[in-house]
Amino acid sequence: MDDLKLVWGDKDLFRLAWLKTNSTFYWSARPAGSAGRFDPVSGRFCGGSIVQHDPAGEVLFLHRNARKLRQGHVEKHWTHIEQFKVGVDLSEYTMSSVIGAPDFPDLRNCYGEDKNYTYYDLTPIEDFPFAVIEDRLIMYFNAGLSFK
């Protein structure tokens, strides 16, 4: 299915399974966004976490899927959130994967729209009511390490 470009990861496979089994599910009208780093010098964005939305289009969940927390690797990655603009035709929505270098040499892949923000809003994380969420996530992760 990946070779045929029919799905974009496990989320689409879940959706196909729900459709096949006639299961009830909800699909948010606002497409997924991306949380990651913004480099003001190059103007590039490098997303590494999926941003999912509630029925009203507000941020509901951040899934740190490409930048896992591991012992010795607990860097902050969320400086900005990129979201598809409300009111723009969905045919303009794309989700791409690009190489992080040279602007993000420590990050192999970047997800989201990395430079052309015509159809996307790029908002600093501090503008959201959950601005400290990554700090808390790292705090809880580090606390969990003490339970070895």
What does each of the following model-derived ranges do?
Residues M1-K148:
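Glycosyltransferase catalytic domains, chiefly GT-A lineage
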